Amino acid sequence: IAVIQILAQLQRFDLAALGADNPVAWHLLAESERLAFADRAAFVGDPDFVQVPTAGLIDAGYIRARGELISASSTMAKVSAGRPRGAPPRKAGTSNEVPSTSHFSAVDARGNVAALTSTVEGSFGSGLISGGFVLNNELTDFDFVPVVDGVPVANRVQPGKRPRSSMTPTIVYDAKGHVLLSVGAAGGPTIPAQVAKSIIAVIDWKKPVQDAIALPVMMVFGDRLIVESSPQGAPLAAMIPALKALGHSEITVTALPYKANGIERVTGGWRGGADPRSEGVALGL
């Protein structure tokens, strides 16, 4: 849901013309992330326990209205969840997602494509092994304050409930139903931001998937903008003065758990890309 919202809210902007070297493009991406993550925090939880207004969250009219809140010349002063069709009253909680996840994208000789993300939450999960499998400690993905201002939190702890996850394995198709791109990532709450950035870089900026994944990634937590401190983040770090001029007053440069990979269809075959920040590789067998 978050990736669909991030991308769709930006449709009225010409990201292709702006390009990857323009601070305005990254500003727009950050603003769209703010809106999408506000909705995610308020409305997304285990659908067996809470009413998730999925159709309303990705409705074209709702997306259009949310996207119109974004300005190319300034930041939004305050961002809160919207009121999509079918949404019950909700308040955002506070979660503590941990970036210990794995993802792979694969294609076989017949063109069948898979995007798979798996997680045990923390490093080695719960520290327990059963039948050769590491058991997870996914309880830490819940919001531990169950009620805010008298309103139940969608991702609150309940017996037998699945916690909200950031896992976002994604396959992108063209208008004829052919696969263009498969991409996913590890990195806890940064996953939707990594995936959205990679899709924009391939589709709008015409980057090879390897270059798209290697581009800097920014993550937004409320009003705080996080820029990675790795060498890959240097081009984005150089844009900080311009981003501050657009109203992003709280910017932090720090290490972030970015580990994306993907495959894209090219003339005559497929091309892979793996995050240079991680131990992953692109490999043909």
Regions found by a protein language model. Give the residues of each.
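Low-complexity, Gly/Ser/Thr/Pro-rich intrinsically disordered linker/tail segments
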Residues: 242-243, 266-285
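Extended C-terminal subregions enriched in glycine
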Residues: 160-163, 195, 204-255
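Active-site rim segments in enzyme catalytic domains, especially the processed small/beta chain
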Residues: 112-176, 181, 205, 209
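Internal maturation/activation junctions in enzymes
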Residues: 12-119, 128, 253-254
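Short acidic-glycine loop/turn motifs at beta-strand connectors
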Residues: 108-110, 173-177, 265-269
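Alpha-helical support elements that line or immediately flank enzyme active sites
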Residues: 8-11, 185-207
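Short Pro/Gly-enriched beta-strand edge/turn motifs at strand-loop
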Residues: 81-92, 147-157, 245-247
